[in-house]
Amino acid sequence: MATLKDRLVDPAGWSDLVMGNWAVARAMIDSGTRVVTSYPGSPTPEIASALELVPEEKRSYRFDFAANEKVALEVAAGAALNGHPAAVFFKSVGLNVAADSLIQLPLLHLAGGLVVILGDDPGANSSQNEQDNRVFARMAYLPMFEPATPQEAYDLYREAAALARKLAMPVLLRLTTHVCHARELVTVQPCASAPPDWTPRFDPTTHGPYVPITRSVFPMKRRALERLESVREVAESAGCNRVLAPNGAAPVAGKRLGIVSSALPAMAALEVLHDGGQPVEILKLGLSHPLPRKKIAEFLASHDEVLVLEELDRVMETEIKSLAWDSGSKAVLRARTDREELMGELGPQRVRALLARTWPEAFSPGPPTAAPAGEPDAVPRLPQMCPGCGHRSAFHAVKAALEKDSITVADIGCHTLGFQAPYEIGQVLLCMGHGVSTASGLSIGNPARKVVAFIGDSTLMHAGLPGILDAAAHDRDIVLVVLDNGTTAMTGHQKRLGSGEDGGAKVPLKPLFEALGVKFLRECDAYAQAQLTAHVKEAMAHPGFAVVVARHPCMLKLTRDQKRKNPAYQTRPVAIDQGRCDQRHTCVAEFGCPSFVRGADGSVTVHPDLCIGDGSCLQTCPVEAIVRPQRPGGAS
């Protein structure tokens, strides 16, 4: 049986159960995309995982991780300028980083076409907010496709790539968390049989202008608007913009009811109609910008009441209300009225309740969901650092150096979890790379309270360097603790730029900091807790900018790598010497490794399936009750 790795490059068409991200990866390959770039971020990283599975000799494409989303977009755009079909993907908030370039790209002629894949995150499942990136399509004059299923993710990527090449422009493909991670039987087309064409085609004398000086901006913007208007004609006849009537169409309580929707809410509405049997039609939009105005006007004209059903912001609602006014529609437009409905994902349960509030004569809210009889509710579990994580060891050491009134600033990454007990480090968080700059601001006019910022090595390369340069140039009175685990761990252990793992140059942090003007710099292993505590105390006493690097490899990645190299590899969990343990619970209450289990009688044991035997906890027990068991044969 063929593996998914083999399926990705199978030249024949096939059908298989795959997740949405894998479907997109296959669509890239069989539609002839030549250059793909990314900065890792949920919910899209499995696209990268799939692309990286293909051996180099079988790839018809070049795939690279970039320093950040802006760089990733610009590399892909440069390839598209040169005539190579290109794509870039990143998470929702990554578009904030790339926005400077995204807004400008529609003004250019991108001969190869460019698909920009956005991993939006309604519900903020793995993001610091749930921003709605549909507004960027309006701001940048860009078409946007919105798949609702893995099959549509595959199909609409192919349509987006074809449209981007035809019009020589960027096209947005907006995925959401459910579409990325849902699995479905996906049918794919055969791969393009022609060999990759790497002929460079950029010619600054044709299809210009390419430089937006004042006299060129209007012609460039005019071209962007004309291209967008041509896409509106495509939207009117696109097969992905269609009316669905699972139960036919008939008046309900004397009114013809309709729904305009897209993406996950459209599928949720279909499920509700399937369960309830109401004869309500849905105009489902797969190409949601520009809106197919004629098709929507016709839909409004054939219904008495129409609900605009969408997640997050009132994007379609605002535009459809304007369209209804312009067209003189007599249909009553309904929309969300509860503030809570502007937050989170709209699954079947929430859509059913929303429909019941909108049309109580046609829908009932349904019974509340409950755990099956006899089954207890799941115990709430906060996210936490893995057993053996060097960040835990670092936080335990740093906390011993902090003063009671110290201000601590978090950043994005696994170390964000330090804000929870027992560490409680990281009192404010904005976005990637903000930590050192926000700490700089907090230090101004604040001589009595030391500000300590934290940043991971991947985030540092992504967006931390300008803040470090600023802090060094102004000699801000702050401490920066760099937690270096050598990878981009939180999103799946993608190769960190500058680590050397991707075959590129290795960029050591010490000379980088020195080049940025850092004068006070200390380094040690995060497991060397006494040394790290001493370094942080010294840094806090230093007047001005001080940097401490706490380095230890991600232990989850390390143990997985060891098991791949040697299937017989086994970890050796630590143990509790019950004769020494006085049940003061430092291991649980202060160090906080989830491998320690406190019993009802107060005793502590080690969970053998969780402990990886790293030993970072040995130095934390005041009575040395945490011990390494002897190996067979008596060796310790």
Where are these regions (language model features)?
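Short acidic, glycine/serine/threonine-rich loops at helix termini
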Residues: I47-A50, V75-A77, A98-L102, N125-Q131, ...
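Thiamine diphosphate
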Residues: M1-P150, H178, G248-A253, P279, L417-V549, M555-K563, ...
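Flexible, low-complexity linker and terminal segments
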Residues: A2-N21, A25, S31, P147-M385, ...
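Short helix-loop-beta junction
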Residues: A50-E57, L270-I282, N446, P511-V518
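A glycine-rich helix N-cap at a beta->alpha junction
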Residues: K58-A66, L108-G119, T199-T205, A473-G486, ...
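Short beta-strand segments
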Residues: F89-F90, V115-G119, L172-H178, V260-S261, ...
